[in-house]
Swiss-Prot record:
Class I viral fusion protein. Under the current model, the protein has at least 3 conformational states: pre-fusion native state, pre-hairpin intermediate state, and post-fusion hairpin state. During viral and plasma cell membrane fusion, the heptad repeat (HR) regions assume a trimer-of-hairpins structure, positioning the fusion peptide in close proximity to the C-terminal region of the ectodomain. The formation of this structure appears to drive apposition and subsequent fusion of viral and plasma cell membranes. The record marks R102, F103 as: Cleavage. Residues 1-19 form the signal peptide. It is a single-pass type I membrane protein; Single-pass membrane protein. It comes from Parainfluenza virus 5 (strain W3) (PIV5). Homotrimer of disulfide-linked F1-F2. GO terms for biological process: fusion of virus membrane with host plasma membrane; symbiont entry into host cell; viral budding from plasma membrane. This is Fusion glycoprotein F0. The lineage of its organism: Viruses, Riboviria, Orthornavirae, Negarnaviricota, Haploviricotina. The inactive precursor F0 is glycosylated and proteolytically cleaved into F1 and F2 to be functionally active. The cleavage is mediated by cellular proteases during the transport and maturation of the polypeptide.
């Protein structure tokens, strides 16, 4: 029953995925995981957003001196004044005067920017192009300043120039204003000051990089999220004509922002948002494939299949998406990154397992399990699979390539030295027997390391033999050295003894000579007497 449920779930995920056979693939350790749509994008349109850095606050008590507002304005002015000066400098350098040709003005302006990358130069030129719109928006600052709406349209005559945003106005309208109605001046000051201080901290984080050069430092997606606050979904819906949610757009990283105007008197900032043009490729799905080792024909093997495929009808192609942006639901690409697969690989993906190619694996540094949607797919013949709650060892028969484990059979699972808590579908083992031809198992780097391990083992054995021979030679050399030293000592002692004998012989001979001479002299003396 668990197997049927699992197959139904995967089949629903892959609805419209053509001839890809998830049930057959899971039998050999290939698990289809994420299924996404494919979209192509290019930068095309832009929108302007004016951000009111100071919310509209109507004090119900006349005569109150709200010092927190003055302090906030002074701090924000110090923080953003370098940005305003930088914007003015770049604008003056890049916008030609009447006496100066446009081309010459741009060249001189870019030279004034110093060393810059192509992206930075593009950002600077974009600043010039947006200057007219930013100026038109800031000319309506009085109308913008009077509104206390969190999001409002900026309209000149019948032309919509952009969207006015007050990131903290929602909080002011719903929380602060009702609270200060019954409060005194000090309480009002404290409440308003706390809100403004929090927003000031966020502004400091957002514009840290822009203080150096706003034209060359685009605003990040995280900064846009903080800057627009709770108004973000509304701003995206009003400014951009797209069916994609604000969360999806932000997670894609395709939205970029750039400061193009600033008015510190009214605390208003104009931001240009670049939005890509998106096109969906119909009837196409990008499917991720997670591959684990499987126990087939009494050996551990791994299927040789791509990690990501594109399925269009009955056509299956590899899709690395190396130059694409991937979100949980969509793959955004500038171009089609598909690669043609061999006939055998396509047949394998379609469920013909006799056409699949496998590689034998040796060692522990490989993938033997994968977790997806609260389910564990594991090769329990090649690793320890132990259920901790309830306590039991999970056995995988030789006829089963992989084992599927879920919470109905095991809540707490141990895989070798790792422990998991499973939260979701039934512990089931595929009972189908898969027979592979010898030609299906190929040695493919880097998965097949058996030959390399054999070579390493042989090298180790040879090294041990050489070490043993070295010990023998060393022992022989040591013995020979000891014998040589003793021989030298014996020769030296023998030589010294011989020299002593010679010296003693000479001395004795001299003494005998003297004695004989004295005796002869005494005999001659007696005879003459």
């Amino acid at each position: 029953m668990g197997t049927i449920i699992q197959f139904l779930v995967v089949s629903c995920l892959l609805a419209g995925a053509g001839s890809l056979d998830p049930a057959a693939l899971m039998q050999i350790g290939v698990i289809p995981t994420n299924v996404r749509q494919l979209m192509y994008y290019t930068e095309a349109s832009s929108a302007f957003i004016v951000v009111k850095l100071m919310p509209t606050i109507d004090s119900p008590i006349s005569g109150c001196n709200i010092t927190s507002i003055s302090s906030y304005n002074a701090t924000v002015t110090k923080l953003l004044q370098p940005i305003g000066e930088n914007l003015e400098t770049i604008r003056n350098q890049l916008i030609p005067t009447r006496r100066r040709r446009r081309f010459a003005g741009v060249v001189i302006g870019l030279a004034a920017l110093g060393v810059a990358t192509a992206a930075q130069v593009t950002a600077a030129v974009a600043l010039v192009k947006a200057n007219e719109n930013a100026a038109a928006i800031l000319n309506l600052k009085n109308a913008i300043q009077k509104t206390n709406a969190a999001v409002a349209d900026v309209v000149q005559a019948t032309q919509s120039l952009g969207t006015a945003v007050q990131a903290v106005q929602d909080h002011i309208n719903s929380v602060v204003s009702p609270a200060i109605t019954a409060a005194n001046c000090k309480a009002q000051d404290a409440i308003i000051g706390s809100i403004l201080n929090l927003y000031l901290t966020e502004l400091t984080t957002i514009f840290h990089n822009q203080i150096t050069n706003p034209a060359l430092s685009p605003i990040t997606i995280q900064a846009l999220r903080i800057l627009l606050g709770s108004t973000l979904p509304t701003v995206v819906e009003k400014s951009f004509n797209t069916q994609i949610s604000a969360a999806e757009l932000l997670s894609s990283g395709l939205l970029t922002g750039q400061i193009v105007g600033l008015d510190l008197t009214y605390m208003q900032m104009v931001i240009k948002i670049e939005l890509p043009t998106l096109t969906v490729q119909p009837a196409t799905q990008i499917i991720d494939l997670a591959t684990i080792s499987a126990f087939i024909n009494n050996q551990e093997v791994m299927a040789q299949l791509p990690t990501r495929v594109m399925v269009t009808g009955s056509l299956i192609q590899a899709y690395p998406a190396s130059q694409c942006t991937i979100t949980p639901n969509t793959v955004y690409c500038r171009y089609n990154d598909a690669q043609v697969l061999s006939d055998d690989t396509m047949a394998c993906l379609q469920g013909n397992l006799t056409r699949c190619t496998f590689s034998p694996v040796v060692g522990s540094f490989l993938t033997r399990f994968v977790l997806f949607d609260g389910i564990v797919y594991a090769n329990c013949r090649s690793m320890l699979c132990k259920c901790m709650q309830p306590a039991a060892v999970i056995l995988q028969p030789s006829s089963s390539p992989v084992t599927v484990i879920d919470m109905y059979k095991c809540v707490s699972l141990q895989l070798d030295n790792l422990r998991f808590t499973i939260t979701q579908l039934a512990n089931v083992t595929y009972n189908s027997t898969i027979k592979l031809e010898s030609s299906q198992i190929l040695s493919i780097d880097p998965l097949d390391i058996s030959q390399n391990l054999a070579a390493v083992n042989k090298s180790l054995s040879d090294a041990l033999q050489h070490l043993a021979q070295s010990d023998t030679y060393l022992s022989a050399i040591t013995s020979a050295t000891t014998t040589s030293v003793l021989s030298i000592i014996a020769i030296c002692l023998g030589s010294l003894g011989l020299i002593l004998i010679i010296l003693l012989s000479v001395v004795v001979w001299k003494l005998l000579t003297i004695v004989v001479a004295n005796r002869n002299r005494m005999e001659n003396f007696v005879y003459h007497k």
